Amino acid sequence: MTYALEVDGVDKSFGGATILRGVAFAVEPGSTTAIVGPSGCGKTTLLRLVAGFEKPDAGTIALAGRVVAGSGWAPAHRRSVGYVAQDGALFPHATVGANVGFGLPRRARTPARIAELLEMVSLDPSYAARRPDQLSGGQQQRVALARALAREPELMLLDEPFSALDAGLRANTRRIVADVLAKAAITTILVTHDQPEALSFADRVAVMSAGRLAQIGTPREIYSTPVDVPTAEFIGDAVVLSARVEGSRARCALGDVTVASNGVHGNARVMLRPEQIEVTTDGAGVSGTVVDVEYLGSEMLLGIRLDTGDGEVPERVTVRRFGATALTPGDRVGIRVLGKAVAYDL
Protein backbone atom coordinates (compact mmCIF):
# COMPACT_ATOMS: atom_id res chain seq x y z
CA MET A 1 0.00 0.00 0.00
CA THR A 2 1.10 3.54 -0.73
CA TYR A 3 0.32 5.56 2.37
CA ALA A 4 -1.04 9.09 2.20
CA LEU A 5 1.60 10.03 4.79
CA GLU A 6 4.63 8.20 6.16
CA VAL A 7 6.73 9.64 8.97
CA ASP A 8 9.83 7.63 9.85
CA GLY A 9 12.31 8.32 12.66
CA VAL A 10 11.69 12.07 12.79
CA ASP A 11 13.63 14.18 15.30
CA LYS A 12 13.33 17.93 15.86
CA SER A 13 15.02 20.31 18.30
CA PHE A 14 14.84 24.05 18.86
CA GLY A 15 17.63 25.89 20.68
CA GLY A 16 19.02 22.70 22.16
CA ALA A 17 15.63 21.51 23.43
CA THR A 18 14.48 18.22 21.93
CA ILE A 19 10.86 18.50 20.78
CA LEU A 20 10.40 15.28 18.77
CA ARG A 21 12.24 11.99 19.19
CA GLY A 22 12.06 9.13 16.72
CA VAL A 23 8.47 9.75 15.67
CA ALA A 24 7.20 7.15 13.20
CA PHE A 25 3.71 6.41 11.90
CA ALA A 26 1.77 5.97 8.66
CA VAL A 27 -1.65 7.24 7.57
CA GLU A 28 -3.88 5.42 5.11
CA PRO A 29 -5.55 7.31 2.23
CA GLY A 30 -8.97 8.69 3.08
CA SER A 31 -8.58 8.12 6.82
CA THR A 32 -8.84 10.56 9.71
CA THR A 33 -6.13 10.57 12.39
CA ALA A 34 -6.15 12.59 15.60
CA ILE A 35 -2.85 13.40 17.33
CA VAL A 36 -3.63 14.13 20.96
CA GLY A 37 -1.36 15.11 23.81
CA PRO A 38 -0.77 17.73 26.49
CA SER A 39 0.54 21.20 25.67
CA GLY A 40 4.24 21.14 24.80
CA CYS A 41 4.37 17.47 23.79
CA GLY A 42 5.38 18.30 20.19
CA LYS A 43 2.15 17.66 18.28
CA THR A 44 1.97 21.08 16.57
CA THR A 45 5.67 20.87 15.67
CA LEU A 46 4.97 17.51 14.04
CA LEU A 47 2.13 19.03 12.02
CA ARG A 48 4.36 21.91 10.88
CA LEU A 49 6.99 19.42 9.70
CA VAL A 50 4.37 17.58 7.65
CA ALA A 51 3.11 20.88 6.21
CA GLY A 52 6.63 21.92 5.20
CA PHE A 53 6.88 24.94 7.50
CA GLU A 54 9.89 23.39 9.29
CA LYS A 55 12.61 20.87 8.38
CA PRO A 56 13.25 17.78 10.54
CA ASP A 57 16.72 17.28 12.02
CA ALA A 58 16.56 13.57 11.19
CA GLY A 59 14.18 11.09 9.61
CA THR A 60 11.99 11.22 6.53
CA ILE A 61 8.49 12.37 5.62
CA ALA A 62 6.74 11.07 2.50
CA LEU A 63 3.43 12.14 0.98
CA ALA A 64 1.74 9.58 -1.29
CA GLY A 65 5.09 7.80 -1.68
CA ARG A 66 7.07 10.94 -2.53
CA VAL A 67 9.77 11.97 -0.04
CA VAL A 68 9.23 15.62 0.87
CA ALA A 69 11.65 15.83 3.81
CA GLY A 70 14.78 13.84 4.55
CA SER A 71 16.66 12.58 1.48
CA GLY A 72 14.71 15.17 -0.54
CA TRP A 73 12.93 18.43 0.24
CA ALA A 74 9.72 19.97 -1.04
CA PRO A 75 8.63 23.36 0.34
CA ALA A 76 5.12 23.88 1.64
CA HIS A 77 3.73 25.28 -1.61
CA ARG A 78 4.86 22.16 -3.48
CA ARG A 79 3.04 19.77 -1.16
CA SER A 80 -0.59 18.90 -1.80
CA VAL A 81 -1.49 19.83 1.77
CA GLY A 82 -4.22 22.03 3.23
CA TYR A 83 -3.69 23.67 6.61
CA VAL A 84 -6.23 25.18 9.01
CA ALA A 85 -4.71 26.99 11.99
CA GLN A 86 -6.18 27.41 15.46
CA ASP A 87 -7.34 30.97 14.79
CA GLY A 88 -8.26 30.39 11.15
CA ALA A 89 -5.66 32.96 10.01
CA LEU A 90 -8.16 34.82 7.83
CA PHE A 91 -7.24 38.17 6.32
CA PRO A 92 -9.30 40.55 8.51
CA HIS A 93 -9.73 43.37 5.97
CA ALA A 94 -10.63 41.11 3.04
CA THR A 95 -14.09 39.74 2.33
CA VAL A 96 -14.98 36.11 2.91
CA GLY A 97 -14.97 35.62 -0.85
CA ALA A 98 -11.48 37.08 -1.16
CA ASN A 99 -10.25 34.87 1.67
CA VAL A 100 -11.62 31.75 0.03
CA GLY A 101 -10.38 32.87 -3.39
CA PHE A 102 -6.85 33.23 -2.04
CA GLY A 103 -6.58 29.44 -2.13
CA LEU A 104 -7.49 29.33 -5.84
CA PRO A 105 -5.41 29.98 -8.95
CA ARG A 106 -6.15 33.48 -10.22
CA ARG A 107 -8.13 32.28 -13.25
CA ALA A 108 -10.30 30.04 -11.05
CA ARG A 109 -11.34 32.81 -8.64
CA THR A 110 -14.87 33.04 -9.99
CA PRO A 111 -18.00 33.82 -7.94
CA ALA A 112 -19.40 30.42 -8.90
CA ARG A 113 -16.36 28.50 -7.60
CA ILE A 114 -16.26 30.54 -4.38
CA ALA A 115 -19.99 29.92 -3.88
CA GLU A 116 -19.42 26.20 -4.41
CA LEU A 117 -16.69 26.13 -1.76
CA LEU A 118 -18.84 28.03 0.74
CA GLU A 119 -21.70 25.61 0.17
CA MET A 120 -19.31 22.71 0.78
CA VAL A 121 -18.78 23.99 4.34
CA SER A 122 -22.50 24.71 4.88
CA LEU A 123 -22.27 28.49 4.44
CA ASP A 124 -24.65 30.46 2.21
CA PRO A 125 -22.89 31.98 -0.84
CA SER A 126 -24.14 35.42 0.29
CA TYR A 127 -21.50 35.26 3.05
CA ALA A 128 -18.89 35.96 0.36
CA ALA A 129 -19.55 39.70 0.70
CA ARG A 130 -19.03 39.77 4.48
CA ARG A 131 -15.84 40.42 6.41
CA PRO A 132 -14.50 37.88 8.92
CA ASP A 133 -15.45 40.08 11.90
CA GLN A 134 -19.09 39.77 10.83
CA LEU A 135 -19.00 36.00 11.35
CA SER A 136 -19.12 33.79 14.42
CA GLY A 137 -16.02 31.88 15.45
CA GLY A 138 -17.40 28.67 14.00
CA GLN A 139 -18.23 30.35 10.70
CA GLN A 140 -14.72 31.80 10.51
CA GLN A 141 -13.23 28.33 10.91
CA ARG A 142 -15.46 27.01 8.14
CA VAL A 143 -14.27 29.83 5.86
CA ALA A 144 -10.69 28.83 6.69
CA LEU A 145 -11.57 25.25 5.78
CA ALA A 146 -13.14 26.38 2.48
CA ARG A 147 -9.93 28.26 1.66
CA ALA A 148 -7.88 25.15 2.39
CA LEU A 149 -10.24 22.98 0.32
CA ALA A 150 -9.84 25.34 -2.64
CA ARG A 151 -6.41 23.86 -3.34
CA GLU A 152 -7.97 20.38 -3.58
CA PRO A 153 -5.33 18.96 -1.22
CA GLU A 154 -4.57 15.27 -0.83
CA LEU A 155 -3.95 15.81 2.90
CA MET A 156 -5.71 18.20 5.29
CA LEU A 157 -3.97 19.32 8.50
CA LEU A 158 -6.11 20.78 11.29
CA ASP A 159 -4.15 22.46 14.10
CA GLU A 160 -6.55 22.69 17.06
CA PRO A 161 -9.13 24.48 14.88
CA PHE A 162 -11.97 24.20 17.40
CA SER A 163 -10.17 25.07 20.64
CA ALA A 164 -11.15 28.76 20.70
CA LEU A 165 -14.87 28.01 20.29
CA ASP A 166 -17.36 27.60 23.14
CA ALA A 167 -18.52 24.05 23.91
CA GLY A 168 -21.78 24.00 21.93
CA LEU A 169 -20.34 25.76 18.89
CA ARG A 170 -17.23 23.58 19.02
CA ALA A 171 -19.22 20.35 18.82
CA ASN A 172 -21.42 21.61 15.97
CA THR A 173 -18.47 22.97 13.96
CA ARG A 174 -16.53 19.75 14.49
CA ARG A 175 -19.42 17.68 13.12
CA ILE A 176 -19.74 19.93 10.05
CA VAL A 177 -15.99 19.82 9.35
CA ALA A 178 -15.83 16.05 9.80
CA ASP A 179 -18.77 15.59 7.42
CA VAL A 180 -17.24 17.88 4.77
CA LEU A 181 -13.89 16.09 4.83
CA ALA A 182 -15.50 12.64 4.80
CA LYS A 183 -17.63 13.53 1.76
CA ALA A 184 -14.55 14.89 -0.02
CA ALA A 185 -12.59 11.72 0.92
CA ILE A 186 -9.62 13.84 2.01
CA THR A 187 -7.06 12.25 4.31
CA THR A 188 -7.10 14.32 7.49
CA ILE A 189 -4.88 14.81 10.53
CA LEU A 190 -6.28 16.69 13.52
CA VAL A 191 -4.03 17.95 16.31
CA THR A 192 -5.81 18.53 19.61
CA HIS A 193 -5.32 18.46 23.37
CA ASP A 194 -9.02 17.61 23.83
CA GLN A 195 -9.36 13.87 24.46
CA PRO A 196 -13.11 13.49 23.71
CA GLU A 197 -12.60 15.49 20.52
CA ALA A 198 -9.84 13.13 19.38
CA LEU A 199 -11.88 10.03 20.18
CA SER A 200 -15.02 11.27 18.43
CA PHE A 201 -13.41 12.84 15.34
CA ALA A 202 -10.93 10.25 14.13
CA ASP A 203 -10.66 6.71 12.77
CA ARG A 204 -7.30 6.38 14.52
CA VAL A 205 -5.78 8.20 17.47
CA ALA A 206 -2.08 8.80 18.17
CA VAL A 207 -1.21 9.74 21.75
CA MET A 208 1.90 11.91 22.13
CA SER A 209 3.93 12.35 25.28
CA ALA A 210 7.22 14.24 25.66
CA GLY A 211 7.98 14.22 21.95
CA ARG A 212 7.23 10.54 21.37
CA LEU A 213 4.22 8.56 20.20
CA ALA A 214 3.06 6.51 23.17
CA GLN A 215 0.33 4.60 21.34
CA ILE A 216 -1.54 4.51 18.03
CA GLY A 217 -4.84 2.70 17.58
CA THR A 218 -8.55 3.00 17.05
CA PRO A 219 -10.41 5.26 19.49
CA ARG A 220 -11.84 2.18 21.22
CA GLU A 221 -8.40 0.58 21.58
CA ILE A 222 -6.86 3.76 22.96
CA TYR A 223 -9.64 4.21 25.51
CA SER A 224 -10.24 0.58 26.49
CA THR A 225 -6.70 -0.85 26.38
CA PRO A 226 -4.20 1.99 26.82
CA VAL A 227 -0.58 0.91 26.62
CA ASP A 228 0.41 2.21 30.06
CA VAL A 229 -0.98 4.00 33.11
CA PRO A 230 0.07 7.53 32.02
CA THR A 231 -1.72 7.05 28.70
CA ALA A 232 -4.77 5.64 30.49
CA GLU A 233 -4.93 8.61 32.86
CA PHE A 234 -4.39 11.15 30.08
CA ILE A 235 -6.99 9.84 27.66
CA GLY A 236 -9.81 9.69 30.23
CA ASP A 237 -10.82 9.26 33.87
CA ALA A 238 -9.18 6.12 35.24
CA VAL A 239 -9.37 4.13 38.46
CA VAL A 240 -5.92 2.60 39.05
CA LEU A 241 -5.45 0.14 41.91
CA SER A 242 -2.68 -2.07 43.25
CA ALA A 243 -3.41 -5.73 42.53
CA ARG A 244 -2.14 -9.29 42.45
CA VAL A 245 -2.69 -10.90 39.05
CA GLU A 246 -3.00 -14.65 38.60
CA GLY A 247 -4.08 -15.82 35.16
CA SER A 248 -7.21 -13.98 34.09
CA ARG A 249 -8.08 -12.75 37.59
CA ALA A 250 -6.73 -9.98 39.79
CA ARG A 251 -7.25 -9.39 43.49
CA CYS A 252 -7.54 -5.70 44.40
CA ALA A 253 -9.45 -3.36 46.72
CA LEU A 254 -12.56 -3.94 44.59
CA GLY A 255 -12.35 -7.70 45.12
CA ASP A 256 -11.63 -10.27 42.43
CA VAL A 257 -11.84 -8.75 38.95
CA THR A 258 -11.37 -10.20 35.49
CA VAL A 259 -8.39 -8.82 33.56
CA ALA A 260 -7.72 -8.66 29.84
CA SER A 261 -5.02 -11.13 28.83
CA ASN A 262 -1.75 -9.25 28.25
CA GLY A 263 0.89 -11.41 29.94
CA VAL A 264 1.01 -9.52 33.26
CA HIS A 265 1.41 -11.71 36.37
CA GLY A 266 2.10 -11.16 40.04
CA ASN A 267 2.16 -7.76 41.70
CA ALA A 268 0.75 -5.19 39.31
CA ARG A 269 -1.65 -2.32 38.85
CA VAL A 270 -5.08 -2.64 37.28
CA MET A 271 -7.03 0.07 35.49
CA LEU A 272 -10.79 0.46 35.19
CA ARG A 273 -12.82 3.25 33.65
CA PRO A 274 -15.31 4.89 36.06
CA GLU A 275 -18.27 3.64 34.01
CA GLN A 276 -17.10 0.05 34.68
CA ILE A 277 -17.78 0.50 38.38
CA GLU A 278 -21.42 0.08 39.34
CA VAL A 279 -22.56 1.72 42.57
CA THR A 280 -25.43 0.01 44.38
CA THR A 281 -27.44 0.84 47.47
CA ASP A 282 -28.46 -2.76 48.24
CA GLY A 283 -25.17 -3.70 49.88
CA ALA A 284 -24.05 -5.99 47.05
CA GLY A 285 -20.36 -6.15 46.18
CA VAL A 286 -17.48 -4.45 47.98
CA SER A 287 -18.75 -1.93 50.51
CA GLY A 288 -17.68 1.65 51.03
CA THR A 289 -18.69 5.12 52.15
CA VAL A 290 -19.40 8.13 49.94
CA VAL A 291 -17.00 10.91 50.97
CA ASP A 292 -17.75 13.54 48.30
CA VAL A 293 -20.15 14.16 45.43
CA GLU A 294 -19.62 16.24 42.28
CA TYR A 295 -22.92 16.96 40.54
CA LEU A 296 -22.62 17.15 36.73
CA GLY A 297 -26.26 17.27 35.68
CA SER A 298 -27.06 13.90 34.11
CA GLU A 299 -24.36 12.20 36.17
CA MET A 300 -22.46 12.42 39.42
CA LEU A 301 -18.82 11.78 40.25
CA LEU A 302 -18.63 10.00 43.58
CA GLY A 303 -15.58 9.76 45.79
CA ILE A 304 -15.89 6.49 47.72
CA ARG A 305 -13.69 5.27 50.56
CA LEU A 306 -13.55 1.48 50.38
CA ASP A 307 -13.75 -0.85 53.37
CA THR A 308 -10.70 -3.10 53.36
CA GLY A 309 -11.55 -5.02 56.53
CA ASP A 310 -7.90 -5.87 57.20
CA GLY A 311 -6.62 -2.83 59.06
CA GLU A 312 -5.03 -1.23 55.99
CA VAL A 313 -5.50 2.41 55.10
CA PRO A 314 -8.80 2.46 53.16
CA GLU A 315 -8.43 2.94 49.42
CA ARG A 316 -10.43 5.65 47.69
CA VAL A 317 -11.92 5.47 44.19
CA THR A 318 -13.78 7.97 42.03
CA VAL A 319 -16.70 6.52 40.08
CA ARG A 320 -19.36 7.85 37.73
CA ARG A 321 -23.04 7.29 38.48
CA PHE A 322 -25.91 8.08 36.15
CA GLY A 323 -29.53 8.62 37.13
CA ALA A 324 -31.57 10.79 39.43
CA THR A 325 -31.04 8.93 42.72
CA ALA A 326 -29.17 11.36 44.95
CA LEU A 327 -26.29 10.21 47.13
CA THR A 328 -24.65 12.33 49.79
CA PRO A 329 -21.44 12.12 51.80
CA GLY A 330 -21.78 9.49 54.51
CA ASP A 331 -24.05 7.18 52.52
CA ARG A 332 -23.09 3.51 52.54
CA VAL A 333 -22.87 1.86 49.12
CA GLY A 334 -21.80 -1.32 47.40
CA ILE A 335 -19.56 -1.56 44.34
CA ARG A 336 -19.54 -4.10 41.51
CA VAL A 337 -17.07 -4.20 38.62
CA LEU A 338 -18.35 -4.56 35.06
CA GLY A 339 -16.20 -5.93 32.24
CA LYS A 340 -12.45 -6.49 32.27
CA ALA A 341 -9.69 -4.48 33.90
CA VAL A 342 -6.37 -3.79 32.16
CA ALA A 343 -3.29 -4.92 34.09
CA TYR A 344 0.14 -3.27 34.03
CA ASP A 345 3.48 -4.42 35.42
CA LEU A 346 4.88 -2.39 38.29
From Swiss-Prot:
| Compartments it resides in | Cell membrane
| Gene Ontology CC | ATP-binding cassette (ABC) transporter complex
* Enzyme kind, highest EC tier: translocase
Could you tell me which SUPFAM superfamilies the record lists for this protein? MOP-like, P-loop containing nucleoside triphosphate hydrolases
Chief location of this protein within or outside the cell:
membrane
InterPro entries per the record? AAA+_ATPase (IPR003593), ABC_SmlMolc_Importer (IPR050093), ABC_transporter-like_ATP-bd (IPR003439), ABC_transporter-like_CS (IPR017871), ABC_transpr_FbpC (IPR015853), Mo/tungstate-bd_C_term_dom (IPR008995), P-loop_NTPase (IPR027417), Transp-assoc_OB_typ2 (IPR013611)
Asked if Translocase is a keyword of the record, the answer is yes
How is the protein disposed in the membrane? Peripheral membrane protein
| Residues that bind ATP | G37, P38, S39, G40, C41, G42, K43, T44
- Known EC number: 7.2.2.7
Give the molecular function GO annotations.
ABC-type ferric iron transporter activity; ATP binding; ATP hydrolysis activity
Give all residue intervals belonging to the ABC transporter domain.
Answer: 5-235
Is Translocase among this UniProt entry's keywords? yes
Q: Which UniProt keywords apply?
A: ATP-binding, Cell membrane, Ion transport, Iron, Iron transport, Membrane, Nucleotide-binding, Translocase, Transport
Domain of life where this protein originates: Bacteria
The record lists the catalysed reaction(s) as: Fe(3+)(out) + ATP + H2O = Fe(3+)(in) + ADP + phosphate + H(+)
> Subunit comment for this entry?
The complex is composed of two ATP-binding proteins (FbpC), two transmembrane proteins (FbpB) and a solute-binding protein (FbpA).
State its role. Part of the ABC transporter complex FbpABC involved in Fe(3+) ions import. Responsible for energy coupling to the transport system.
Regarding protein family, the annotation reads: Belongs to the ABC transporter superfamily. Fe(3+) ion importer (TC 3.A.1.10) family.
Q: What is this protein called?
A: Fe(3+) ions import ATP-binding protein FbpC 2
Source species: Rhodococcus jostii (strain RHA1)
